[in-house]
């Protein structure tokens, strides 16, 4: 079966592998994952990775997506791409993805990307083809700001939802993962490419 693509980005100090494993559990073989690696933060792999800036992440993400489409065209379903970002990956996604909403239509922004929106940017996201935005927060600071951003999206005609995992902090822990799993039917609503588990 052909499957939709899910772009996955990590936070500073995180790794592409860890977030690929996380999202593989969440989507349970219902999407093709493309996990974008950052630069090494130091000589020790335990130092993790980071993205230098959003134009670099944008360039590398869409080059990787083009390569994936060229190599695995027979396995990729037509239609919009999903984007899941944590922390730095979420913030940079919010900065770069409005211009790519004709291709990347549904976003999951976890503990980042919550303060980069306005009604005008939300409207531009919708006008270019954006369909849904899920904010996930573990801190009050994130949740307060994401609540405003979700309201901006609703004003612009884009379904948006906030999942606040009170007490989880700046993490993508098991509680956050469980909340994302629970919200997945909302995120993928009306997308026939996502078969129920």
Name every feature range the model reports, one short phrase each:
Residues 156-158, 188-197:
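Alpha/beta-hydrolase-fold serine-hydrolase catalytic core, especially in secreted/extracellular enzymes
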Residues 95-105:
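Conserved hydrolase catalytic core segment
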Residues 85-89, 93:
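Gly/Ala-rich beta-loop-alpha elbow adjacent to hydrolase catalytic centers
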Residues 74-86:
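Alpha/beta-hydrolase fold nucleophile elbow
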Residues 3-76:
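Serine-hydrolase catalytic machinery in alpha/beta-hydrolase-like enzymes
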Residues 37, 84, 110-111, 136:
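Alpha/beta-hydrolase-fold catalytic nucleophile elbow
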Residues 112-185:
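The feature captures the conserved acid-bearing segment of alpha/beta-hydrolase catalytic domains
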Residues 103-114:
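A conserved short beta-strand
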